[in-house]
Amino acid sequence: MKMTKKKRTKVFLTLLVILIVLLAGIILTNSFGGRQETIQETMRDAVLHETGKISFLGIKDVNPAFLSAVTVTVVLLIAAALIRIFAVPKFTYIPGKFQMLLEQVVGLFDGLAKSNSPHRNGFLGAYVFAAGVYIFCGTLFELFGFQAVTTAGESIALPAPLSDINGAIALGCLSYCIILSGGIAGNGVRGIGKTLKDFSLPISMSFRLFGALLSGLLVTELVYYYIHLSFVLPVVVGVLFTLLHALIQTYVLTMLTALFYGEVSEPVRKKENAERQKKAA
């Protein structure tokens, strides 16, 4: 009984401390004076990036997402080089935890490429792996809350690279170029025609990425503005949206790229023979 009372007392005191901290946070995070951006201004800037520019190496003022893209790219390249130099030579027939994890990730994207493009998948597997890792890590990047100083002297949290429409369009167009190269490699000039037939593909890919990431940002901003508990619920909402978008958008873009690549790179003769066999059956 004594232990039970002690436990109850500890639980009660813990809850009381948490409640006091939350109340203090609510009071301290409320604005007293000074101008704050309205929700309309915040959401407009999230889409158009008219304000909040960052000086990039003193050369040019850029959107925060560009700096995020450069940071994520450099980190991934350094990580890839370190893994190749120090980890890969130590791989064994009986894999350790890190080797097993790496093999599972590589095998996932390699299997995706082979299942959707069985006739031509060497380069496709490498591309969907690189694109998938970039989308996943880039989406999770905003969770770290790295700060940068704008040209106006204000502090701003770096967003996900693909939350900028320019980054999303660049990745969508790059994926379309990869699909086009597969069509040329598989069917020559005829492959170009098959690929250009889906001219809206890069637009749909780009806006799918941008729209998904932007929706998470806007929902989080709405929660910040209209729910006063601005340091508890937005964290949960932001993490959930970010994790879901990282997984979903990685899968969607890599799947679409592999699917269309396999379609345009499939040799025409094999496709015609397969259709004849189906009709004969």
Per-region residue spans from a language model:
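Selective transmembrane helix interface/packing segments
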Residues: 2-281
